[in-house]
């Protein structure tokens, strides 16, 4: 009897590490100390901060993983994992510094999980943070064949005086919406149920879709770090940032407004076809759509109304599609006009 016969293949682990080494190294920032393989990752705080505050976030990808398994496509899931974490850290105004991942599977497939980590590295590059370390657990009998779980953890930094917590948001402030890339990483339990009850598979291509249902739904979550951080460094007064994740617009927008509320104009932004298809095919009510999906908006910013046009133009030059979607109001919660 040995470890391999018990279901843990150490040699496969070595192969996996060899496959990911180059992708991980490409994410390296100057503040990183040491390299791959240490017991802990070392990272020096960047210079220039008077009162640095660390901001931490952790998240996973949820049942979007089931779609990756069904299509045997694993190169985008890692980007999703990074995006879910770094966008949350960004919502406090922070610059993401480093990221760590946790991967668990029943039987380690070096090629499959290397694809996941390569996606994580791509997401880290897009967010400007280091992939500082990670854990890969091979757990025989714990997961179905070919399946795995992934979670991430991100740490960022922000000057104490520049923390964005919604407390400076004022009634009348403009709300700007940054377009999402699609469903992102929330609501997939409902998505999967809709597709199942409709008797469809992931290769089905609805009439108004640019690709198959599976390809559209696997589009990775958009990472907003660089354009929004650039706007902050350019001096724009962004007073609140809402990352539109689980809970949709209904639950997430108020989290960024310091106890105030939002009036959103429904016709002010285009809702991507994937959402109208899900609503129609699944017979999903408007309230459920509003509190489950991002409906085409991945990030919502609150800023003084006199800066709204300039901020919108600035972010557009950074490659974002930005729309003025409403205003901050006195009454808490979200209402639609």
UniProtKB/Swiss-Prot annotation:
Its EC number is 6.3.3.1. InterPro entries: PurM-like_C_dom, PurM-like_C_sf, PurM-like_N, PurM-like_N_sf, PurM_cligase. It is found in: Cytoplasm. Signal peptide: none annotated. One of its GO terms (biological process) is purine nucleotide biosynthetic process. It holds the Pfam family AIRS_C. Pathway: Purine metabolism; IMP biosynthesis via de novo pathway; 5-amino-1-(5-phospho-D-ribosyl)imidazole from N(2)-formyl-N(1)-(5-phospho-D-ribosyl)glycinamide: step 2/2. One of its GO terms (cellular component) is cytosol. It is an enzyme of class 6 (ligase). The keyword Ligase applies. Keywords: ATP-binding, Cytoplasm, Ligase, Nucleotide-binding, Purine biosynthesis. It catalyses: 2-formamido-N(1)-(5-O-phospho-beta-D-ribosyl)acetamidine + ATP = 5-amino-1-(5-phospho-beta-D-ribosyl)imidazole + ADP + phosphate + H(+). GO terms for molecular function: ATP binding; phosphoribosylamine-glycine ligase activity; phosphoribosylformylglycinamidine cyclo-ligase activity. Belongs to the AIR synthase family. NCBIfam families: purM. This is Phosphoribosylformylglycinamidine cyclo-ligase. The lineage of its organism: Bacteria, Bacillati, Cyanobacteriota, Cyanophyceae, Gloeobacterales.
């Amino acid at each position: 009897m040995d470890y391999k016969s018990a279901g843990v293949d150490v040699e496969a682990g070595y192969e996996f590490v060899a496959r990911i080494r180059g992708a991980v190294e490409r994410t390296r920032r100057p503040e990183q100390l040491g390299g791959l393989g240490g017991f802990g990752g070392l990272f020096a705080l960047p210079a220039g901060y008077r009162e640095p505050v660390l901001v931490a976030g952790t998240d996973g990808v949820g049942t979007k993983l089931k779609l990756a398994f069904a299509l045997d496509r694993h190169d985008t899931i890692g980007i999703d994992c990074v995006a879910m974490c770094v966008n949350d850290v960004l919502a406090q105004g922070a610059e993401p510094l480093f990221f760590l991942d946790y991967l668990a599977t029943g039987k380690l497939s070096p090629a499959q999980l290397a694809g996941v980590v390569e996606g994580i590295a791509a997401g880290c590059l897009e967010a400007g943070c280091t992939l500082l370390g990670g854990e890969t657990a091979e757990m025989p009998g714990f997961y179905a064949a070919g399946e795995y779980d992934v979670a991430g953890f991100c740490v960022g930094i922000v000057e104490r005086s520049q923390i964005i917590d919604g407390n400076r948001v004022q009634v009348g402030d403009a709300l700007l919406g940054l377009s999402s890339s699609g469903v992102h990483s929330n609501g997939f339990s409902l998505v999967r149920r809709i597709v199942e009850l409709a008797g469809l598979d992931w290769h089905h291509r609805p009439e108004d879709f640019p690709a198959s249902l599976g390809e559209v739904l696997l589009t990775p979550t958009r990472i907003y770090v660089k354009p929004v951080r650039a706007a902050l460094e350019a001096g724009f007064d962004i007073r609140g940032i809402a990352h539109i994740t689980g809970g949709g617009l209904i639950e997430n927008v108020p989290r960024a407004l310091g106890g105030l509320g939002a009036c959103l104009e429904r016709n002010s932004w285009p809702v991507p076809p994937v959402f109208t298809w899900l609503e129609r095919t699944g017979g999903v009510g408007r309230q459920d759509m509003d509190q489950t999906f991002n409906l085409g908006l991945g990030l919502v910013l609150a800023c003084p109304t006199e800066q709204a046009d300039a901020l919108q133009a600035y972010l557009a030059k950074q490659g974002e599609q930005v729309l003025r979607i409403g205003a901050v109001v006195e009454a808490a919660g979200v209402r639609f006009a």
